[in-house]
Swiss-Prot record:
Name of the molecule in the record: Uncharacterized lipoprotein SAS0073
Lineage: Bacteria, Bacillati, Bacillota, Bacilli, Bacillales
Similarity annotation: Belongs to the staphylococcal tandem lipoprotein family.
Keywords: Cell membrane, Lipoprotein, Membrane, Palmitate, Signal
Lipoprotein keyword on record: yes
Record organism: Staphylococcus aureus (strain MSSA476)
Signal peptide residue numbers: 1-24
């Protein structure tokens, strides 16, 4: 009888040990993912994007020794109301640390998917450059609303703040060492600072609080080949989609 009890106690102890180790590994990977993103997100807000001319980033053997690198920043909002096309608006900017110049494009898109048909992509690009932290069209823009949107555009990196990133709890963690790829997803509230900032700047047609997804590929410690992006998903289903995505990373310059 005593032997059976001892075996039972031993079995339960081993079970708790396995559970603890598994949970510990999960928490460890979550902390790694957060730290990986914190390297970039701790710079937010970058109110003046010209500060990036003097900002170092992760470098590996993909960089030429004389190349300071180019920061690539991209922010976009996508909204699909029921029965309508997915409407996307955003801007991509390449900030060259070698030439201390920045150029890119503002873009709009409407993606329509009819029954039994392939999605129709209607992307339009409007070339821009940045001077004195302001965005200027480099080609004539006939649409007055697009002109204003370009002039008033702000990247997420300019107004967001992730000082509480390490305090986010109960994340849904995914890690695939084969790719490698990794992600951490958190349910936010409408009281979250960054959620308030997005609602202040965009007409978001839902009161649902979003989920925040931190997603990346490549080495967790850093990679110029992989990517990192963050996504706020307010709605995601067959008929409606509302999400905001943002990314900022240093890449080898194209002319080096």
């Amino acid at each position: 009888m005593i032997k059976r009890v001892n075996k039972l106690v031993l079995g339960i102890s081993l079970l708790f040990l396995v559970i603890s180790i598994t949970a510990g590994c999960g928490m460890g990977k979550e902390a790694e993912i957060k730290k990986s993103f914190e390297k970039t997100l701790s710079m937010y807000p970058i109110k003046n994007l010209e500060d990036l001319y003097d900002k170092e980033g992760y470098r590996d053997d993909q960089f030429d020794k004389n190349d300071k690198g180019t920061w690539i920043v991209n922010s976009q909002m996508a909204i699909q109301n029921k029965g309508e096309a997915l409407k996307i608006k955003g801007m991509l900017l390449k900030i060259d640390r070698n030439t201390r110049s920045a150029k890119g494009f503002y873009y709009t898109n409407e993606i329509k998917t009819e029954k039994y048909e392939v999605a129709q992509d209607n992307q339009k690009k409007y070339p821009v450059k940045m001077i004195n932290n302001k965005f200027i069209s480099t080609e004539e823009v006939k649409e007055e609303n697009i002109k204003k949107e370009i002039e008033n555009f702000k990247f997420f990196a300019q107004y967001s703040n992730f000082k509480d990133l390490m305090n986010y709890k109960d994340g849904d963690i995914s890690y695939n060492p084969e790719v490698p790829s990794y992600s951490a997803q958190y349910q936010l509230t409408n009281d979250d600072y960054n959620v308030k900032q997005l609602r202040k700047r965009y007409d978001i047609p839902t009161n649902k609080a979003p989920k925040l997804l931190l997603k990346g590929t490549g080495n967790l410690k850093g990679s110029s080949v992989g990517y990192k992006k963050i996504e706020f998903t307010f709605l995601e289903n067959k008929n409606e989609n509302i999400y905001f995505t943002d990314s900022l990373h240093l890449k080898p310059s194209e002319d080096k």
